[in-house]
């Protein structure tokens, strides 16, 4: 019962789409109609720049943190992981936006930094390094997600947290499947390339 309650609460928190809300009320646009069509911080960055993307990213991270803390309060570490997966699913497929959300990376950052701070920080640092070196946000996001899985395999804590990391990485890779195709084709947008709003 608590597991279901935890998942529902976390999912609904994830459904609060900060990219959509911020751009709708500050620029009167639906961010999903611009750039990559993704309702997330990276697309806000691409379309509106750093000043708009920063609060969206921060709020997306925060909702991951809040969901995990609620899950931990209700069910301990198991609840934290259930909530972590559910909040990312809510971000990716929000019921209030007809299941068209973001890719879950910023929210995943909040989740892993709360569930496993040290390994989360290492994975984040590696992901950011890849972004800085290549200018591909998608590549850095995927790398960071996979790194978190590998770190959990190397510094084994429990089967539960390894499966948790594997699910999070799978969600990230699935949401970036179109980016992977563009990366392979050499057509993926780099950090700094901006889409103008007419």
From Swiss-Prot:
Gene Ontology BP, a term: phospholipid biosynthetic process
Sorted UniProt keywords: Cell membrane, Lipid biosynthesis, Lipid metabolism, Membrane, Phospholipid biosynthesis, Phospholipid metabolism, Transferase, Transmembrane, Transmembrane helix
Name of one Pfam family that matches: G3P_acyltransf
Predominant subcellular localization, coarse grouping: membrane
GO MF annotation terms: acyl-phosphate glycerol-3-phosphate acyltransferase activity
Disulfide links within the chain: none
Location of this chain's protein in the cell: Cell membrane
The organism's place on the tree of life at top rank: Bacteria
Catalytic activity: an acyl phosphate + sn-glycerol 3-phosphate = a 1-acyl-sn-glycero-3-phosphate + phosphate
Topology relative to the membrane: Multi-pass membrane protein
InterPro entries: G3P_acylTferase_PlsY
Pathway of action: Lipid metabolism; phospholipid metabolism
GO cellular-component term (any): plasma membrane
Quaternary structure, from the entry: Probably interacts with PlsX.
Similarity annotation: Belongs to the PlsY family.
Summary of the function given for this chain in its UniProt record: Catalyzes the transfer of an acyl group from acyl-phosphate (acyl-PO(4)) to glycerol-3-phosphate (G3P) to form lysophosphatidic acid (LPA). This enzyme utilizes acyl-phosphate as fatty acyl donor, but not acyl-CoA or acyl-ACP.
Protein name as annotated: Glycerol-3-phosphate acyltransferase
Biological source species: Thermoanaerobacter sp. (strain X514)
């Amino acid at each position: 019962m608590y597991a279901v309650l935890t998942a529902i609460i976390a999912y609904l928190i994830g459904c609060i789409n900060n990219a959509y809300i911020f751009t709708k009320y500050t620029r009167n646009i639906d961010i999903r109609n611009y750039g990559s069509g993704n309702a997330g911080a990276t697309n806000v960055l691409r379309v509106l720049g750093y000043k708009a993307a920063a609060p969206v990213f921060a709020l997306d991270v925060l909702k991951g943190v809040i969901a995990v803390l609620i899950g931990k309060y209700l069910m301990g570490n198991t609840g934290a992981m259930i909530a972590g997966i559910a909040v990312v699913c809510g971000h990716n497929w929000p019921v209030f936006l007809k299941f068209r959300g973001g890719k879950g990376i910023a929210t995943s950052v909040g989740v892993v930094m709360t569930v496993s701070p040290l390994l989360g920080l290492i994975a984040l640092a590696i992901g950011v390094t890849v972004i800085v070196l290549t200018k591909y946000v998608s590549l850095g996001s995927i790398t960071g997600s996979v790194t978190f899985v590998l770190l959990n395999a190397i510094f084994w804590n429990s089967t539960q947290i390894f499966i948790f990391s594997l699910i999070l990485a799978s969600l990230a890779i699935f949401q970036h499947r179109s980016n992977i195709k563009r990366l392979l084709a050499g057509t993926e947008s780099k950090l700094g390339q901006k889409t103008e709003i007419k």
